[in-house]
Amino acid sequence: MTSRLVTPQLAEQFKQYPLYSQDGKKKDAICLCVFFIGKVRWYVLEGQPEGNDFTLFSIVVGLADTEYGYASIKEMESISVDVGHNLPKIPILQDKSFKPCPIGNIPDERLQSFLSNMYDREEV
């Protein structure tokens, strides 16, 4: 299943990273892609088709709290922001310049603060 957000290339990548495949990898988990709208980011770690939808597991940054969570591609594709002034609504988009890498290497202060709070305390 492909869609506006899940391209054939991304669907192929997800075959290597189905849900639960990166459990326990912490900061070494590979982030496959990034979706965004405004200052909100979905750092996607895993995904797989489920029926006529796609379920993603990601870290969401930029909402009230940063957290791990599951997201439906169909729901994400239905989200848009109306900025008014007769401008078109802004949908969630994929950061096409992003290259897969360990989540701990991504230069987003909010993300790294979340990861440090989750995992650095475990090592003490």
Kindly give the residue locations of the regions a language model identified.
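N-terminal domain-onset segments
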Residues: 1-38, 122-124
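Acidic, aromatic-enriched beta-alpha/helix-loop junctions
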Residues: 45-82
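Short linear sequence elements within intrinsically disordered, low-complexity coil regions
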Residues: 19-22, 47, 75, 103, ...
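An amphipathic, hydrophobic-aromatic interaction surface with interspersed Lys/Arg
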Residues: 31-53
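Low-complexity intrinsically disordered segments
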Residues: 84-124
